[in-house]
Every structure is written in C-alpha cells, then in structure tokens.
C-alpha cells in the first residue's frame, strides 16, 4: 500500500470513526474464513460495519474522534466493529457470536463517547435493542387509548346483552 492509499484509508476511517455511535475493538484469533464471512453477513444485515484494520492506520485515523481514547488498544489482530445508529445491536450480535467461540474476544469499546470494557459490552448486550424499545414505547402510548375505548364501549355492550336477554325472554314467553 503506497502513501496515497494509506492517506485515503486513514481519511475514510477517520470519517467513519467520527460518525460511529459505537466502536468496538475485538480480537478475531483462530477464526476461519467461513466463520468470519458469516459474522460479517449478520453484522451487515444489522447495518453494522466489520473491518480488519491495520493498527497503525487505525490509530492515526482515531485522532480527533471518540475512538482516540482507546487507540492504545490497537495491538495485535484487531477487528473494528462500528455502528452508526444503534449501540445495542452490535453488542448483542458480538456477544451471541462469542458464545461458541473462545478465541474471539472483545477488548474494549467506545459507546457514544464513553469507554466501555468487555464486561460492559456483555451487559449492554442484555438490554433491549432500539427497535424493541420503540415497540415498547408505542405499546405504552397505545395502551391508554385501547383501555379508554374498552371502557367507553362497555356500557353499550352491556346494554346490548340486556336487550338480547330480554328479547330471548320474550320469545320464550310467546
């Protein structure tokens, strides 16, 4: 890689690191190509980026971004996982991926500007994702309206049942 290519990579990484809400550093030791491809596919489906980065280029790209606070962790084989929307989804996907693989470990992360260790990522993985939270909020907002409709409809339903019972009673008498 010549100097111009390196500068392009650094510039591109710098922009992505600056935009990322979550940047997770992982150590992908002992993974075969098929396993890494499967992980990349799952992450891509969730709109999460997975890159194997050259440490010196990544450390230079991190300058002036929140990732700079963990730049000293760019040592040895390093995978950089970045999410630009949701901070929980990449943590969940990586935690799930790590269950079956002893060699794949999370070193550290920067989540919305805060440094988080591997245990913090595991805790974050147990939280509901952004879509789940939106669903829960929508359900909480809709619940009072549903209950109000049920309460307002109850007298009418009761009246209909009373009238129906009275009709049956009159039909039996005739």
UniProtKB/Swiss-Prot annotation:
Q: Which GO terms describe its molecular function?
A: large ribosomal subunit rRNA binding
Q: Which UniProt keywords apply?
A: Ribonucleoprotein, Ribosomal protein, RNA-binding, rRNA-binding
Source organism's superkingdom? Bacteria
User: Per its UniProt record, what Gene3D superfamilies does this chain match?
Assistant: 3.30.70.1730, 6.10.250.290
What span is annotated as the signal peptide, if there is one?
none
What do the Gene Ontology cellular component annotations say?
ribonucleoprotein complex; ribosome
Task: Name any Gene Ontology BP term.
Answer: translation
Protein role:
Forms part of the ribosomal stalk, playing a central role in the interaction of the ribosome with GTP-bound translation factors.
Protein family membership: Belongs to the universal ribosomal protein uL10 family.
Q: HAMAP family from the entry?
A: Ribosomal_uL10
Q: How does it assemble?
A: Part of the ribosomal stalk of the 50S ribosomal subunit. The N-terminus interacts with L11 and the large rRNA to form the base of the stalk. The C-terminus forms an elongated spine to which L12 dimers bind in a sequential fashion forming a multimeric L10(L12)X complex.
**Protein name (database record):** Large ribosomal subunit protein uL10
User: What gene codes for this chain?
Assistant: rplJ
